[in-house]
Amino acid sequence: MSITLDKRLDGSVDRVPHVWTAHVHAGATITCPSHLVAKIYDPVFFDDDETRYDDPFYRRDHSISSEVEAYRRLVPLQGTKVPRFYGHFAAMVPDQDSRTVFILLLEEVPGRDLRAIVPPDEAKKVCSKHKEAIVDVALRLFFDVRAYGVDQQDMVSRNIILRPQKHVSASPTQFCDTERCLVALDVDCSDLDMVMVDFEIVDFKEPDPSFSEQAEQRTKIEKIKPTYLRRWLQNGL
């Protein structure tokens, strides 16, 4: 297998992984899409300031093990609420004395992350209708993932992708009554299909199906929703 990197994507708050779209040239014995997302764990590019406090190799190993275990637990949600996971492996970097990096291969989920749709410094321009709908669906996704024992500790808007919406861009439809709402023409509140990505910073718990049961989930959401409405899209949590 060989990989050709294409476009650099936003990464996580951890500085070890570099995230790219990639063309995958697989051998005859490997079955996977030709276009995936590659998360490259390379301690050489770890932030210099952070190496004063953390061993980059420990951070790399911890990040990889967290992601792999998360995707193992989340197999039933792969392809719907989380990306499909196609494995991880070590690879040698050409022209760098065969230096080894570790790579995770993931489905490239179409859509945009919520931070790109609602930049934190413009979150106050989002109307209450849109904010309520976005936060509600994001929290339902959080608890659906938690039901499988994966407690996301990096629950930020950058880690939630909104899939393409059927009626957006097809016509100049305004999806709320607030004329100056930042996403009035860009987000259909009735068609919010979200995917969670990035499981480097998680806590693993016992699976608990009650987190995905509608009544129980609604109770849990109502307890934390006011805080999320005030601060989440502004990266204030």
Can you say where each PLM-predicted feature lies in the sequence?
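Residues on conserved beta-strands of the protein kinase catalytic domain
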Residues: S34, R99-I103, D193
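Conserved long hydrophobic alpha-helices within structured protein cores
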Residues: P17-V19, P33-Y41, P76-Y86, V150-I160
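C-lobe/activation-segment region of protein kinase-like
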Residues: K124-A138, D144-L237
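Conserved structural core of kinase catalytic domains
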Residues: D42-D49, Y58-D61, V68, R72-I134
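ATP-binding glycine-rich loop module of kinase domains
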Residues: M1-R73
